[in-house]
A protein has these predicted regions:
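Extended carbohydrate-recognition surfaces in non-catalytic/accessory domains of CAZymes
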Residues: 22-109, 162, 168-171, 183, ...
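Extended substrate-binding grooves/exosites of carbohydrate-active enzymes
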Residues: 49, 53-56, 124, 129, ...
């Protein structure tokens, strides 16, 4: 009897296995061997950026150029234009991978490889790509042996003067392999889009394409599941046609938006008889998008102005190597500011970034190219455009079109061809490709030569005409635009260094200083740009502007304007947050305008000005209130009200004649009804006497700590997956607990237990200290230490030491 039962169970198990055999399987490939010269090899974890460890040196990609986009006519030495890190040159990755038995096809998927990847399998070239920012797929079935070990090799080549910013080097985004049986859904040919939706009902169209041994009659079940896994709609399609199309009707749908990023799961199951041939699942959101002259930009039928930022792909001290926790930190910090959209400037986004934007609620303008035929740098993408651009734009759209967060495609940024008929024809061609593979979203691009683009018809052909800067020309632009609206596709380019203030305070488009820093009074910008105040005036006074994307949400490696020719500047000053991810004063300026759920009252500058006693030291307040009263050591400096007629006083509260005296400044802010909404205070700090930690574990907390001021004990949990990160902001305090804003002590870091020291960053654009060495100076009193979990569970102990003052502090994190 026992023997018979075992036989029956074995048979049942075999039948179950048969019914599930050969359905797709996705395997991540994180462990590779890496070499720069093909001789010395080291094991690395992918994503990997071979250049981020440095050292910084002006010799790396030293460019003698005139940047036409900046209005330059004479060539000058640009020492930090692409980050001053060793990303140029060749690199090689290899791994041995055993292809499991029972499958018929294998496809390698690269989410991005910098750059010009050539992929070989078992010594034979299997495929190649040109653009380092694009995802691509290579069918390696003809080159592998199932059930045996196979050698996969990737050769990369980064050439000098091929980038205007830091691109990184290597397999900087994930690599995976997809395994299939006899028949499967073509992964990027599955397209889910909302046809119409309101609170009562939605219609969702699903398109799919079968590949492999098609032609046989079969059954495809398409189901829509809610977040709890409950089936809310289903359709069954039968027959031999490999092209599948159906519509799902959903009652009382949850609509996706930044405020409520609800995600459904689409599950496609292909049957051959009773056997499951393939299962494809993907997350999507139900939502509608529209743009029009009368209603502007609409999400789910509601008009809203885009409150966006531009983001480069690097993650500061982590370089280009993608990391989930770091991306979450970026997105959450922007959302807490009130930002609701990201422009992926100026290249294709990653899968991970888009998935996080879907789940966290961040709209996206997914960009493609920084140049077309005419180059902006000698060896840039223009070399590949004619051969590769159709493939690249097709990959972008087909790869990412199921992400509800993406609300428009961008086909270019400040393209030199915008003056010509040829440029207009290219623009229309690229836009048509976007429409071919995704008729549900509008297409835009950022134009910086408005007169040329309007004269050639370049601007008129776009679904959404996007203009970079020159906000004062919006009036003339709109007169020639049949669309009846425009987008501030790139705005502001205000420059500042966190915690640095310059006197006298001036409004300037060309201010520079011997120390290579910019003033955080937020009155300095570039020759082609403007202040945030100028953009907001246009948006508030005229409905024709459907929103903006500020340059930039974060500082990034490379492009150290206005210090392009000043060494050792090697990263940007444009960010609302600095390179370490710490908010500058400007963060609170945007928060006061964009975050409608919380009040903002932020006072600047700091109040440590030894040697300026009795000198005029202006005080600003960023607030959503309309009025404020400032006190210096308890004495009122008067109540100030925002003034719509003044460029700098419409969106700021300013006390321009305050004379410095040590002690305390305090501001109290009020709304239009005279009710108090907030206050902020700054104290003159004494000598540093103690250390403070503020901890961020982005994958485990709802809000970025640097905004809300987390304590040492807050959110100390990490995933024991070898990838999770904790960001610990370190600052020095005096004996009374006041932050020391001028402290520049060198700190050392030691990590023990179930984790490792990953990197450190202080936000100083002129610092040449390597990110990956366990010591760094404070900048404006702060720096950020990044700790990475291992795959071992247990305590992770970070110890930070200031030898100069004999101050030491530790914190224990937990990897679970």
């Amino acid at each position: 009897m026992i023997k018979r039962s075992i036989t029956f169970m074995t048979l049942a198990l075999a039948l179950t296995t048969l019914c599930q055999a050969q359905s797709r399987k996705i395997i991540n490939l994180p462990s590779w061997d890496f070499s720069r010269d093909g001789k010395a090899w080291q094991q690395v974890a992918v994503p990997h950026d071979w250049a981020i460890s440095g050292p910084f040196d002006k010799k790396w990609d030293l460019q003698m150029v005139a940047i036409e986009q900046n209005g330059e006519t004479e060539k000058t030495e640009k020492s930090g234009r692409s980050g001053a890190l060793p990303w140029i040159g060749e690199g090689m990755y290899k791994m041995n991978w055993t292809a499991p038995k029972g499958y018929k096809r294998a496809v390698l998927v690269f989410d991005g490889a910098m750059s010009q990847p050539v992929v070989s399998v078992n010594g034979k070239e299997a495929g190649r790509w040109a653009y380092g920012y694009n995802a691509f797929r290579i069918d390696i079935t003809p080159f592998i042996q199932f059930g045996k070990s196979n050698l996969i090799e990737v050769h990369l080549n980064n050439v000098e003067e091929s980038s205007r910013w830091y691109p990184g080097g290597g397999l900087y985004r994930p690599v995976s392999v997809e395994l299939y049986g006899n028949e499967n859904f073509s992964t990027w040919d599955t397209f889910v889009r909302t046809l119409k939706a309101d609170k009562q009902e939605a219609e969702v169209e699903v398109n799919a394409l079968l590949e492999g041994k098609t032609g046989k009659s079969g059954k495809t079940v398409i189901a829509l599941l809610d977040e709890a896994g409950k089936k809310v709609a289903e359709q069954i399609v039968t027959g031999a046609n490999p092209e599948i199309k159906t519509t799902l009707k959903v009652a009382n749908p949850q609509l996706w938006s930044p405020e409520s990023p609800y995600l459904y799961q689409v599950k496609l199951t292909r049957y051959e008889g009773k056997k499951v041939a393939d299962v494809q699942t993907l997350k999507t959101g139900i939502r509608t998008i529209a743009v029009s002259k009368n209603n502007g930009f609409q999400l789910n039928g509601i008009t809203r102005k885009l409150k966006g930022v531009c983001l480069h792909h690097d993650l500061g001290p982590l370089g280009a190597a993608e990391n989930k926790a770091a991306l979450i930190r970026q997105i959450k910090m922007m959302k807490q500011m009130g930002c609701d959209a990201i422009r992926t400037a100026h290249n294709m986004p990653s899968t991970m970034q888009m998935e996080l934007c879907d789940s966290l609620g961040m709209m996206v303008m997914a960009e493609s190219f920084d140049m077309w035929i005419y180059p902006k740098c000698k060896n840039g993408y223009a070399k590949f455009f004619k051969e590769w651009s159709d493939k690249d734009i097709t990959n972008l759209v087909k790869h990412h079109r199921n992400h509800p967060s993406i609300v428009m495609w961008s086909i270019g940024n400040e393209i030199p061809e915008q003056w010509s008929k040829e440029g207009m024809e290219i623009a229309k061609h690229l836009q048509d490709i976007c429409h071919q593979y995704d008729p549900s979203r509008p297409v835009t691009q950022g134009m910086d030569k408005a007169e040329d683009a309007l004269k050639s018809g370049f601007a008129q052909v776009m679904d959404v005409p996007g203009f970079n800067y020159r906000v004062h020309k919006y009036f003339k632009n709109i007169e020639q635009l049949p669309q009846g609206f425009l987008l501030g596709s790139e705005t502001a380019s205000t420059v500042s260094s966190r915690g640095v203030y310059k006197f006298p305070v001036v409004v300037s488009d060309k201010a520079t200083y011997p120390d290579g820093q910019c003033s955080s009074y937020d009155t300095e910008y570039c020759s082609w740009s403007n202040l945030p105040d100028d953009d907001w005036k246009m948006q508030d006074d005229y409905s024709l502007v459907i929103g903006e994307f500020v340059w930039t949400g974060y500082d990034y490696l490379g492009e150290p304007t206005p210090y392009d020719t000043y060494w050792p500047s090697r990263s940007s000053y444009f960010g609302i947050c600095d390179l370490a991810g710490l908010p500058k004063d400007r963060y609170y300026m945007y928060r006061a305008r964009w975050n409608e759920q919380q009040h903002t009252t932020h006072l600047l500058p700091h109040w440590n000005w030894k040697g300026r006693e009795g000198e005029v030291t202006p005080v600003y307040c960023y607030t959503d209130g309309v009025e404020g009263e400032l006190f210096v050591n308890g004495k009122s400096q008067g109540r100030v009200r925002k003034d719509k007629s003044s460029r700098l006083d419409r969106y700021r509260l300013r006390w321009n004649n305050v004379k410095y005296e040590p002690g305390e400044i305090r501001v109290v802010t009020y709304n239009q009804y005279g009710d108090k909404i907030g206050e902020d205070v700054k104290h003159t700090a004494g000598e540093p006497a103690q250390m403070k930690f503020s901890v961020e574990t982005p994958d485990h907390e709802p809000i970025a700590c640097m905004v809300e001021g987390c304590t040492d004990e807050h959110n100390v949990i990490l995933n024991a997956d070898g990838n999770d990160l904790a960001f610990i902001t370190v600052s020095l305090l005096d004996k009374d607990g006041n932050e020391c804003p001028l402290a520049d002590d060198e700190l050392t870091f030691e990590v023990s237990g179930a984790g490792t020291f990953k990197a450190a960053c202080n936000g100083d654009a002129t610092s040449l200290e390597p990110f990956t060495q366990p010591q760094m100076k404070l900048f404006s009193g702060k720096l950020v230490v990044i700790v990475q979990s291992s795959k071992q569970k247990g305590d992770i102990i970070l110890k930070v030491k200031d030898s100069k003052r004999n101050i030491e502090k530790s914190i224990t994190l937990q990897a679970i």
